[in-house]
Amino acid sequence: MAAEPNKTEIQTLFKRLRAVPTNKACFDCGAKNPSWASITYGVFLCIDCSGVHRSLGVHLSFIRSTELDSNWNWFQLRCMQVGGNANATAFFRQHGCTANDANTKYNSRAAQMYREKIRQLGSAALARHGTDLWIDNMSSAVPNHSPEKKDSDFFTEHTQPPAWDAPATEPSGTQQPAPSTESSGLAQPEHGPNTDLLGTSPKASLELKSSIIGKKKPAAAKKGLGAKKGLGAQKVSSQSFSEIERQAQVAEKLREQQAADAKKQAEESMVASMRLAYQELQIDRKKEEKKLQNLEGKKREQAERLGMGLVSRSSVSHSVLSEMQVIEQETPVSAKSSRSQLDLFDDVGTFASGPPKYKDNPFSLGESFGSRWDTDAAWGMDRVEEKEPEVTISSIRPISERATNRREVESRSSGLESSEARQKFAGAKAISSDMFFGREVDAEYEARSRLQQLSGSSAISSSDLFGDMDGAHGAGSVSLGNVLPTADIAQFKQGVKSVAGKMAVLANGVMNSLQDRYGSY
């Protein structure tokens, strides 16, 4: 493998190539003193146009600096020697490529043919000359004295003039007509050959000068075009923008189509999963109906009264796969049961029967409701199964002795107790939170309640003040008012109504849970 050229050889070669007039301007824009080169086309470019060529890709144009890069190889140097701005301009013009847009110009058929031609010429020059710095056709790039010297050598070689005629060949071309007359006058026998030979040399020099002038004209024209075009940013044409816009529209359509396909697949998978879920719900509903049918009469009535009897509910239902239907609101069974419980609790005798046994329901929801309404011993489901003691007047505890965690449940039935609070404290000038929530001591509360009752009377007795009402009433008339003071009766009624409110809230929670779980049927 041949050794790579050193830095001195590279600088010498490019100094000579850039001395050619056509290589002193940029090939694309005509800017002066280009310092970059496209090895693919063998042309010299300015720094702006070199950036445009880099954006095209190395498969279209390979760019290197003639001053900064020192890793040139012999094949790349041969491509620059066989190329040149003049040869590239003539080739593109000959094949009808006059486009100014770089993308259009270097993707054309003419650019492809010229790339192949430069590659072939560079390979041939490398195989012929090897590591020699100069090649044969470099003589056309040197100054004009070399052809004249060759012509003079040619004439001296063939005419063999005498020694005294030698000084006549040394002057420049402007003094050549005088020696021609002398030679024609001195050597008469050789007049014909000498005249012909001397007559050909001026023609050759004239032709050479005309070719040089012809080469300068395109360079001047390019300089004018470069001055009009200005910076490289003005090379972008409307065609490139339209092409980019078209590509963007195609990409947008493709993205929309992909999004639509993905959405369609998601909908199909959702419909399939909904069908499976609906089938599972149908199977579960049939199982629950069978369980409910196997219940005995009393338990079945209790389940239907609490809203757990799915068979007795309305047969109107809808599927998740069918169209939606408007379902009219019906009065829940739990509301009727709660109202009936309130009516039953108004009578003291029926209070001993107790609430229904929720442990007997077919859905085994006792633990969930026990955890929802707090773990109170009085409302636990395990305690419901035990035999409840008979409720008497002495077994009723005051509000202050009850568990504090029940107040969270009582807050939910505050709407039912608001009317009682208004009636209780209607005549009071000021009340406290202990009075409102019943957190006062029993004796103090009873004394205050008696004072409030006797505030409007004109005269009072000790029996009225201390609650000794035996003398006022007959012995035969025994009632709840005779057994309990007025304050205790109010507390008893309030306790009964609070219990009824709790039962209503609990029944409502049972109904809501059943509707949430089995409402899709």
Swiss-Prot record:
Residues 97-521 are annotated as: Required for interaction with coatomer. InterPro entries: ARFGAP/RecO, ArfGAP_dom, ArfGAP_dom_sf. Keywords: Acetylation, Coiled coil, Cytoplasm, ER-Golgi transport, Golgi apparatus, GTPase activation, Membrane, Metal-binding, Phosphoprotein, Protein transport, Transport, Zinc, Zinc-finger. The modification Phosphoserine is found at S140, S146, S201, S237, S240, S312, S334, S340, S364, S368, S432, S433, S513. It is a peripheral membrane protein. It holds the Pfam family ArfGap. GO terms for cellular component: cytosol; Golgi apparatus; Golgi membrane; plasma membrane. Residues 171-186 have a biased composition (Polar residues). A zinc finger (C4-type) spans 26-49. Residues 11-127 form the Arf-GAP domain. It is found in: Cytoplasm; Golgi apparatus membrane. CDD domains: ArfGap_ArfGap2. Residues 242-308 form a coiled coil. Interacts with the coatomer complex. Interacts with the C-terminal appendage domain of COPG1. This is ADP-ribosylation factor GTPase-activating protein 2. It comes from Homo sapiens (Human).
